[in-house]
């Protein structure tokens, strides 16, 4: 009975560790969106509306990434639990590449032909101009975010998400600093959109680098 209780306690601690990390990661994502939205609002209602139109593309991206990522969490977890880290790593990479390609095709198509997306909404000329600017600057980088989030879900399967969460914090801080500087020095709105793009790239590249770390190259204890 004591052995069963100890095992149950260990499982609970592992779940709480992953859950706490996931909570922090969600806060950094929501915080980034809040900071960007507040910063864009300084440029007027039309700019805010344009940003809203462009950023709603994430509504399509998020479920697709979750669909792939949730499968990876289970697949990686099974293999990591069996100490088949090489196989788990391969599964994670395949999932990330699939996400990168699928979202890359969608986001680049929208960046090149923004009317494909914007024609689904009623817009005025000024807000549409800002939306097009956002899609051109940020659109091509959604594939990095998709791949990064897919690898984040895969990392949950290993039970070790410290470094992935750090990547999310770095993204939040980077975007926040650039937004602050943009507002303080009255830079153009495009600087905020470039900050968003850089943040998406941080997610993809950062989570990819995490795959090279010890969490993916050692046995699960």
Where are these regions (language model features)?
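Helix-loop interface residues and adjacent transmembrane-helix termini in multi-pass membrane transporters
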Residues: 42-45, 82, 157-158, 186
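Single conserved hydrophobic/aromatic residue that forms the stacking wall/gate
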Residues: 1-8, 12
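Residue-level signature of transmembrane alpha-helical cores of multipass secondary-active transporters
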Residues: 14, 18-26, 38, 59, ...
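Small-residue-rich hydrophobic transmembrane alpha-helices
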Residues: 50-114, 145-167
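Short membrane-interface helical motifs at transmembrane helix boundaries
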Residues: 105-128, 132
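Alpha-helical transmembrane segments of multi-pass membrane proteins
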Residues: 125-151, 177
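Helix-terminus/linker motif at the lipid-water interface of multi-pass membrane proteins
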Residues: 27-60, 78-79, 116-125
């Amino acid at each position: 009975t004591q052995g069963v209780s100890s095992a149950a306690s260990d499982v609970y601690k592992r779940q709480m560790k992953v859950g706490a990390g996931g909570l922090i990661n969600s806060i950094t994502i929501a915080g980034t969106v809040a900071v960007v939205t507040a910063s864009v609002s300084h440029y007027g209602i039309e700019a805010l509306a344009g940003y809203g139109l462009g950023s709603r593309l994430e509504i399509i991206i998020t479920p697709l990434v979750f669909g792939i990522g949730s499968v990876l969490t289970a697949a990686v977890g099974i293999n990591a639990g069996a100490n088949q880290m090489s196989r788990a790593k391969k599964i994670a990479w395949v999932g990330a590449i699939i996400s990168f390609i699928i979202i890359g095709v969608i986001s680049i198509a929208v960046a090149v032909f923004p009317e494909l997306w914007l024609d689904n909404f009623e817009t005025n000329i000024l807000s549409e101009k800002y939306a097009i600017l956002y899609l051109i600057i940020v659109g091509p980088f959604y594939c990095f975010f998709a791949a990064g989030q897919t690898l984040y879900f895969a990392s949950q399967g290993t039970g070790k998400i410290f470094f992935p969460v750090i990547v999310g914090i770095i993204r939040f801080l980077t975007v926040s600093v650039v937004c602050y500087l943009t507002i303080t020095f009255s830079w153009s709105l495009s600087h905020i959109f470039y900050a968003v793009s850089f943040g998406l790239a941080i997610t993809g590249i950062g989570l990819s680098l995490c795959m090279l770390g010890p969490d993916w190259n050692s046995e699960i204890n």
